[in-house]
Amino acid sequence: LGKGKGGGIVPEHSTGVKFVRGGNQFKPDNKPLKVGKNIVVIEPEGFCPYCNKFREDVSNNYAGNIPLSYRKASNLEGLSIKTPTWATPTILFLENGSEVFGYQGYLTPKEFYKALGFFKLGDSEAYRVAFNEGTDARFCKEYEIFKNTPDGIFIDKLSGKPLFDTRDRFVSRSGWLSFTRPVEGSVYEKPDNSYGMRRTEIRSVSSDIHLGHVFDDGPKGMPRYCINATVLEFVPRGGV
């Protein structure tokens, strides 16, 4: 962190959290971390190759709606932390200022999103779909909400990255959200031979969660991406 031109306030890395000067050091304001769910990444004062790797692989690409902030181990005043913070990075998952759980050391994107999934989704249908290759019930509540949204984008429920566009949505009468294509580069395909069937699974590139399957019976010879609504969130166009 560096001193601002007026000697006053220095913003923390893209989090919007402001630092106020106290004595000879800048101390972060931890009040926002005491409200709701937050992710805190502990980094050292000096160079940390695995901290840099975590930023490059995970946090710089994270766009989810649970705030992610950075702190030094000496800047955790007012927070209830259980995990030792001598190893860096240490990733903490907080709720109302208290640690729910934490991890010492580097997490791969897959490990981070598995932890985030448990933190955000808990023991829910969305978690089962995302991480256990589950399937929404036909015409589930989320489907009924999302089938007639205004113009916009469906995003990954964990990473916040765009996945599908309402312009590519169509009514398949299948009971699941259906699209003719994903947002370019947002998903990848994987063979799925479970339950004695040959299908093509669709997974999110950013978080690696299970999204659904793609079939060849879409309108006018196009594909039909059959997608579980519980692992999506919706953002009106212009809000991504």
For each of these PLM feature ranges, what is it?
Residues 28-64, 147-164:
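Local sequence-structure signature of Cys/Sec-based thiol-disulfide redox active-site neighborhoods
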Residues 82-92, 198-200:
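Structural micro-motif
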Residues 42-44, 63-78:
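Thiol-based oxidoreductase modules, predominantly thioredoxin-like and allied folds used
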